[in-house]
């Protein structure tokens, strides 16, 4: 699907679920960002190869580069949430985000591996499958740009 087609799947209910869960997840960008990344690495060890510049990711919060990447990731998600009501702007920021991943030869399928860790981080904050499915639809917008 095109990026616009994927963005069209973000219905009013999906946007509400994204915003409601983001209020909690986004309130601790550093902690939840590091949790997201360390869960990605634990569940999909092959993804560590894309992040060699981060050094020893097993250090978690003690790794400055991992913390920096995690915080940057969370602000990208904040940007996506902020643009949910304007599909043109959402596509613009998603495509900018996608460039960083295309440069590193990260495919749509590889990028989709983030859905499992997102589901786990959401579950740790008592957000169930409905919310994980909403985030998967947002991830699909990024995947369409890759």
Curated annotation (Swiss-Prot):
Q: Which compartments is it annotated to reside in?
A: Cytoplasm
Give the signal peptide as a residue range, or say none if absent. Answer: none
* GO MF terms, alphabetically ordered: heme binding; identical protein binding; metal ion binding; oxygen binding; oxygen carrier activity
Q: Which residues form the Globin domain?
A: 9-146
Which GO CC terms are listed, alphabetically?
A: cytoplasm
What is this protein's name?
Globin-1
Highest taxon in the source lineage: Eukaryota
Q: Name one Pfam family in it.
A: Globin
Q: How does it assemble?
A: Homodimer.
- Give the organism's phylogenetic lineage: Eukaryota, Metazoa, Spiralia, Lophotrochozoa, Mollusca
Which family does the similarity line name? Belongs to the globin family.
Segments spanning the bilayer are none
InterPro entries for this protein: Globin, Globin-like_OT, Globin-like_sf, Globin/Proto, Mb-like_M
Residues that, per the record, bind heme b: 101
Keyword list, A-Z? Cytoplasm, Heme, Iron, Metal-binding, Oxygen transport, Transport
Q: Which organism is it from?
A: Anadara inaequivalvis
